[in-house]
């Protein structure tokens, strides 16, 4: 049996997880996408098929603070705090965390911890 690449393993985990993670109006889904250089997070209402709010390391608000945010845990925690602030402003307090097939470690964990500290419950 051949070994799958890390990207294919992540995609396979994501498909398996998405069967059970469904966000609605009361508890939307906090979806995380991690690339080599950036991290993106969205709060999604799957029943209405709308994105309630989003944040990433390429946001204007974050780029104004510094020219280039490094792809590390510090920038991920900044994104998590910003996303939580935007979600609470829209009236969302509880979410379902969708790690996107990524292992709950490093940048994904930093984003989740920062969102929890800023007031989101999951």
From Swiss-Prot:
Gene Ontology CC annotations of this record: cytosolic large ribosomal subunit
GO molecular function: 5S rRNA binding; structural constituent of ribosome
Keyword RNA-binding: yes
Keyword Plastid: no
GO BP annotation list: translation
Intrachain disulfide bonds: none
Keywords: Ribonucleoprotein, Ribosomal protein, RNA-binding, rRNA-binding
Pfam families reported in the protein's UniProt record: Ribosomal_L18p
Family, per entry: Belongs to the universal ribosomal protein uL18 family.
Described purpose of this protein according to its UniProt entry: This is one of the proteins that bind and probably mediate the attachment of the 5S RNA into the large ribosomal subunit, where it forms part of the central protuberance.
HAMAP family reported for this sequence: Ribosomal_uL18_B
Subunit details: Part of the 50S ribosomal subunit; part of the 5S rRNA/L5/L18/L25 subcomplex. Contacts the 5S and 23S rRNAs.
Name listed for the protein in its UniProt record: Large ribosomal subunit protein uL18
Upper taxonomic lineage: Bacteria, Bacillati, Cyanobacteriota, Cyanophyceae, Synechococcales
Gene: rplR
């Amino acid at each position: 049996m051949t070994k799958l690449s890390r990207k294919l393993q992540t995609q396979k985990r994501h498909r398996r997880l998405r069967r059970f993670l469904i966000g609605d109006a009361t508890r939307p889904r906090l979806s995380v996408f991690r690339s080599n250089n950036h991290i993106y997070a969205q709060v999604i209402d799957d029943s209405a098929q709308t994105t309630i709010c989003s944040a990433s390391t390429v946001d204007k608000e974050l780029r104004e603070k510094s020219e280039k945010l490094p792809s590390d845990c510090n920038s991920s925690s900044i994104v998590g705090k910003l996303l939580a602030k935007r979600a609470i402003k829209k009236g969302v307090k509880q979410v379902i965390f969708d790690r996107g097939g990524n292992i709950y470690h490093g940048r994904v964990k930093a984003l989740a911890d920062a969102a929890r500290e800023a007031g989101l419950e999951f």
